């Protein structure tokens, strides 16, 4: 099996509401795939199911050929391999930027303080924040907080990075610095599954774009193909609305 990630007929309900209705797709190493769709279409739920923050009701998810949805799956090992960057940063307010990054390295990977610090500083430098290593989250802008979140995920050396609307909580002028880091990661070959409506990033960096609606993948394809020649009316209307909301500049 050559796929890094394979999602096979995944269903998820919350009470009587079925949020994921038989989602299936695959990703190869180095792919940067983006999930788009209206609010409530299941995008974030799909991400959370991949690293077991949310449990699926049925179906299977494979990472590197291994079924990671079985009861005996080592969830901590899964989360070492699948990093996640959250919409609201999820940083510990009482820890510095550096310590937010080293925490997982020490607690999960069991590294000593010096090893963890070396890796953390390398990743903070990678996202342009080494100078802020001793700053606390309250002293950082939203864009800086999100870049710390990315550094924290990268420090675990994951096979796959999940991004759940990483720019939606940011002031508009701070979006660019986060998108730039994501674009750099894409160009370096990081495998990424992203929920985002940042169309500039989608057009320039995405391998494929998946359009979700009502818990299903309506259409999948290269961004250029979907923007220029969508097969489904639902795709066309959604993307037209998205372009209008973002000023039509893509």
Segments the model singles out, each with a brief description of its role:
Residues 224-250:
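C-terminal boundary and immediately downstream tail of ABC-type ATPase nucleotide-binding domains
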Residues 3-5, 11-214, 218-223:
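ABC family nucleotide-binding domain
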């Amino acid at each position: 099996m050559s796929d890094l990630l394979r999602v096979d007929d995944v269903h998820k309900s919350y009470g009587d509401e079925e949020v994921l209705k038989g989602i299936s797709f695959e990703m190869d190493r180095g792919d940067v795939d983006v999930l788009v769709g209206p609010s409530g279409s299941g995008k974030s739920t799909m991400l959370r199911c991949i690293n077991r923050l949310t449990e699926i009701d049925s179906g299977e998810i494979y990472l590197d050929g291994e079924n990671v949805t079985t009861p005996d799956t080592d969830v901590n090992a899964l989360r070492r391999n699948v990093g996640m960057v959250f919409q609201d940063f999820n940083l510990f307010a009482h820890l510095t930027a550096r310590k937010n990054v080293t925490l997982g390295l020490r607690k999960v990977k069991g590294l000593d303080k010096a090893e963890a610090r070396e890796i953390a500083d390398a990743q903070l430098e990678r996202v342009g924040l080494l100078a802020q290593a001793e700053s606390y989250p309250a002293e950082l802008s939203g864009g800086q907080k999100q870049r710390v979140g990315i550094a924290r995920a990268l420090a675990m050396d994951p096979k796959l990075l999940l991004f759940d609307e990483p720019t939606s909580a940011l002031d508009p002028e701070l979006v660019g610095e986060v998108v730039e880091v994501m674009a750099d990661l894409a160009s370096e070959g990081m495998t990424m599954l992203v929920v985002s409506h940042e169309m500039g990033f989608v057009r320039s960096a995405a391998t494929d774009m998946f359009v979700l609606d009502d818990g299903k993948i309506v259409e999948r394809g290269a961004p250029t193909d979907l923007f220029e020649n969508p097969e489904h009316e639902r795709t066309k209307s959604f993307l037209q609305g998205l372009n209008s909301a973002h000023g039509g500049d893509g």
